[in-house]
């Protein structure tokens, strides 16, 4: 495990530059789905009992990206390598999670709170920690509970399937979960509740969300209330992206310093507008009297 990056103003500025570059890359390559998958698969190996795995950039090594569940993920790793060379200060772990956050946002999804400072690691976990699409509810709970996540997290994060499609050469399955696989919305849950979604994919793990009564409550909620889905998804995605990671205090200090500055600028602008309105009203009244 490498040393944690120093998250200072310079690092945060580099993160914002990388964020802009990621928006452009994802828009030009239409690669939001695989960027979200990369972020998920790097983080989703976490084991809270042993404190191993998690969002540490180890997925960039052959011993991990060659796992069966990661078939095709090298495409995203290769797309991001020039970005890493352009922004060398940022760790792979931070870059991969930032790519996932941006992928959701640029496709119409919620804004996800992102705090940098993750360490890079070359220690890859053993194969088999990611969900197996051919299994059901008990398996999903086993995998997500191992990470320290909840039933709500399971369903909310499954909503990420609103982006992208399964490919037979990668998973053995073929097709998209929604009619617009490049738009982040709640249509995944709407389609899940339909008895027949012609031409759309429903994996055994997807069907488990409807068959399990606890999971189904969240599916029904998210299908009828996209705002609720976006709120819960943003919360669950943040939890996933920070598994085993304690954000550095410096990042919070930086963010807190930015908010008052922004608020001050907004307040100053508001005062200036109000003063202009008062001055204009006074001028109009004076003109009336002179007339």
Swiss-Prot record:
Q: Which InterPro entries match?
A: Ccp1-like (IPR044831), Haem_peroxidase (IPR002016), Haem_peroxidase_sf (IPR010255), Peroxidase_I (IPR002207), Peroxidases_AS (IPR019794), Peroxidases_heam-ligand_BS (IPR019793)
Q: Where are the transmembrane segments?
A: 263-283
Predominant subcellular localization, coarse grouping = membrane
The organism's lineage is: Eukaryota, Viridiplantae, Streptophyta, Embryophyta, Tracheophyta
UniProt protein name: Probable L-ascorbate peroxidase 3, peroxisomal
Question: In the UniProt entry, which residues are flagged as the active site?
Answer: 41 (proton acceptor)
Q: Where in the cell is it found?
A: Peroxisome membrane
What is the main EC category here?
A: oxidoreductase
Q: Which cofactor does it need?
A: heme b
Tell me its EC number(s), please.
1.11.1.11
Q: What are the protein's GO molecular function terms?
A: heme binding; L-ascorbate peroxidase activity; metal ion binding; peroxidase activity
Gene3D superfamilies tied to this protein: 1.10.520.10, Peroxidase, domain 2
Q: Which GO terms describe its biological process?
A: cellular response to oxidative stress; hydrogen peroxide catabolic process; response to reactive oxygen species
Known catalysed reaction(s)? L-ascorbate + H2O2 = L-dehydroascorbate + 2 H2O
What this chain does, per the record?
Answer: Plays a key role in hydrogen peroxide removal.
Q: Where does heme b bind?
A: 161
Give the free-text miscellaneous remark of the entry: Binds one cation per subunit; probably K(+), but might also be Ca(2+).
Q: Which family does it belong to?
A: Belongs to the peroxidase family. Ascorbate peroxidase subfamily.
Keyword Metal-binding part of the UniProt annotation: yes
Q: GO terms for CC?
A: chloroplast; peroxisomal membrane
Q: Region labeled Disordered — which residues?
A: 114-133
**Where is the site described as Transition state stabilizer found in this chain?**
37
Q: Does the keyword Transmembrane helix apply?
A: yes
